[in-house]
Amino acid sequence: TVRATYRTASSLEKAKHVFSYFTDQVDKEFSKIQWVQADVREVSSLEAAFQNIEKVYHLAALVSFDTSSYSKMRSVNIYGTANVVNLCLAYKVQKLCFVSSIAAISKTLNKPFIDEQDEFNLEENNYGYAITKYGAEMEVWRAAQEGLQVLIYNPGVILGAGFWRENSGALFSMTYKEFPFYTEGVTGFVGVEDVAALLVKGMDSEVTNERFVVVSENKSFKEIVDSIARVFEKKPPKIKVSKLLSALGWRLSWLKSKLTGAANTFSKHTAKAAHNSSYYRAEKVKKTFEFEFEPMEQVLKKVAKRYQKDLEN
């Protein structure tokens, strides 16, 4: 039996749509899963999902770089994770696989790449999302100390189809609309199908109480959007945004959010991250699970084709 939680009816419909990328028998495959409406912040709603469960994948999180979302992120990412691990312990779950983020790992000075040996540095990664993902990891390690078998995954920017207005999905919708601006920051990227495959491999293995950086390739944002633009046969961005312009942009976005009450869509951290270059090494996960990542060019082409198909439908 596979049981999965969803928070709202609309999110369940989005999940169902994702199934359409992989099967023509969406209803049949979707009905194989027991869907339970729950919120990680509400223990009573989660308890129904934990009945007779042996293995747990915890992926639920709030991703935001808007400082006004910090308290909500703490509630979902830290306290929600605490609820999940406490129930894992209470219901004697065999193993927990937790999806964290590369945001919870900081650079070490004079080291060319970031890997599992690097730790979180509050002075460097002092923005809300990173702090809350690190806090969530601490809850998972606490559960490990109490006897729960755990694995922590730190994926880079996850690229996948279906959620075109949110997070990395916006890269595809913006590129399709020929958004003209770009920055040259570098970070780690990975396809969602690789993340899913590694979660299953980890759960089915004897490996426990380890963490893994999950990154296919390190790419600049410019390289990513140029690749997407080629698939779409659209114009790639041509206007390079300087650090000065980004600094002005986040201040204007902040002012607009204060005056109108709208979400701050371009925060100070977003501006900084757009110009940062961080290189990640994922040798540990490749070696442990004898795994080869799908090349980013292939991932981008596949996801972009799915975006086009959704537009047609």
Segments predicted by a language model, with ranges:
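Mid/C-terminal beta-alpha module of Rossmann-like enzyme folds, strongest
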Residues: 198-266, 282, 287, 294-313
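NAD(P)-dependent short-chain dehydrogenase/reductase
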Residues: 144-189
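Substrate-positioning beta->alpha
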Residues: 135, 166-167, 183-203, 210
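Active-site Tyr-X1-5-Lys
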Residues: 124-152
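NAD(P)H-binding glycine-rich loop region in Rossmannoid oxidoreductase-like domains
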Residues: 23-79
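Glycine-rich phosphate-binding loop and adjoining beta1-alpha1-beta2 segment
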Residues: 4-29
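Conserved Rossmann-fold NAD(P)-dependent oxidoreductase catalytic core, especially the SDR/UDP-sugar
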Residues: 79-128
